[in-house]
């Protein structure tokens, strides 16, 4: 269950009333990695659901795995524990912290993929204009709670392939990348990623590492996000609202 019913005091002008409302669930998820033995790799604050995709995407973004072939099995151990058995020793150090849902040091193992520079993917303005509304229409839990971020993957013709929601925008992107790993679609060189929030370094670096050539958001990018998108050959689009958007890098992909 991704929502929880709560009682709220609703204030309207000079009146107040007790009403039922719904809020998004947020719970800790322990990520265990196993080779010779098992150890806690991280604890992620997330919205329950699609935990397998979340953990795989997170491990990929952290540089702990390179492909799905590095993983022997993924096991759900109770409500809030996922155990990942690896085919080789862990590449990075175990995190000694809780990763909150907004993150702050995500993508620490990020290395951009040079093959994106050779990608000839193109998309029309009309398709770009259509993405925010398609994202909003398919955010089922957000419609109930108003409290979740989303990340979605679209084709260059505007067809929605996947959409994931989470209390943390970084988690939503990791779930998306985990799905791509499971379906062996990385690098995702023929797709567009649309996110519901701002475009910070962590979000953009995750998309770049997955080989996504066009990354869009409804809010602003940060300076570092612009820098890495430019260097990696990725088209970065911000302030995508209504009938306008800003292209910050590699305009040639938008026709």
Curated annotation (Swiss-Prot):
Chief localization: cytoplasm
Family annotation (Pfam families): FdhD-NarQ (PF02634)
Q: Supply the alphabetized keyword list.
A: Cytoplasm, Molybdenum cofactor biosynthesis
Matching entries from InterPro entries are given as:
Cytidine_deaminase-like, FdhD
User: Which GO CC annotations does the UniProt entry carry?
Assistant: cytoplasm
Compartments where located: Cytoplasm
What does the record give under GO molecular function?
Answer: sulfur carrier activity; sulfurtransferase activity
Does the keyword section mention Cytoplasm?
A: yes
Any idea which residues are catalytic in this one? 103
Taxonomic superkingdom: Archaea
BP GO terms, sorted: Mo-molybdopterin cofactor biosynthetic process
Q: Extract the NCBIfam families matched here.
A: fdhD_narQ (TIGR00129)
Q: What does this protein do?
A: Required for formate dehydrogenase (FDH) activity. Acts as a sulfur carrier protein that transfers sulfur from IscS to the molybdenum cofactor prior to its insertion into FDH.
* Family that this chain belongs to: Belongs to the FdhD family.
Kindly provide the name given to this protein in its UniProt entry: Sulfur carrier protein FdhD
**Organism expressing this protein natively:** Sulfurisphaera tokodaii (strain DSM 16993 / JCM 10545 / NBRC 100140 / 7)
Its ancestry begins with:
Archaea, Thermoproteota, Thermoprotei, Sulfolobales, Sulfolobaceae
In the UniProt record, the gene name given for this protein reads: fdhD
């Amino acid at each position: 269950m991704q929502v929880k019913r709560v009682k709220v005091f609703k204030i309207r002008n000079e009146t107040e009333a007790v009403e039922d409302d719904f809020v998004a669930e947020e719970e800790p998820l322990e990520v265990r990695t196993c080779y010779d033995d098992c150890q806690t790799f991280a604890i992620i604050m997330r919205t329950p659901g699609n935990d397998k995709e979340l953990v795989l995407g997170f491990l990929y973004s952290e540089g702990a795995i390179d492909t799905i072939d590095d993983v022997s099995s993924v096991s759900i151990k109770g409500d809030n524990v996922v155990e990942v058995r690896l085919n080789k020793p862990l590449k990075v150090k175990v995190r000694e912290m809780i990763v909150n849902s907004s993150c702050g040091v995500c993508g620490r193992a990020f290395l951009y993929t040079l093959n994106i520079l050779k990608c000839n993917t193109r998309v029309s303005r009309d398709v770009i204009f259509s993405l925010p509304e398609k994202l909003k229409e398919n955010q089922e839990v957000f419609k109930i709670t108003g409290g979740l971020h989303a990340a979605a993957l679209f084709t260059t013709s505007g067809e929605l392939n996947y959409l994931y929601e989470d209390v943390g925008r970084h988690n939503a992107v990791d779930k998306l990348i985990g799905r791509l790993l499971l379906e062996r679609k990385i690098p995702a060189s023929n797709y567009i990623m649309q996110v519901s929030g701002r475009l910070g370094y962590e979000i953009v670096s995750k998309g770049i590492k997955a080989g996504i050539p066009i990354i869009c958001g409804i809010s602003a990018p940060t300076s570092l996000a612009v820098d890495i998108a430019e260097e990696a050959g990725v088209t970065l689009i911000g302030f995508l609202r209504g009938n306008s958007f800003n292209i910050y890098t590699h305009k040639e992909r938008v026709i």
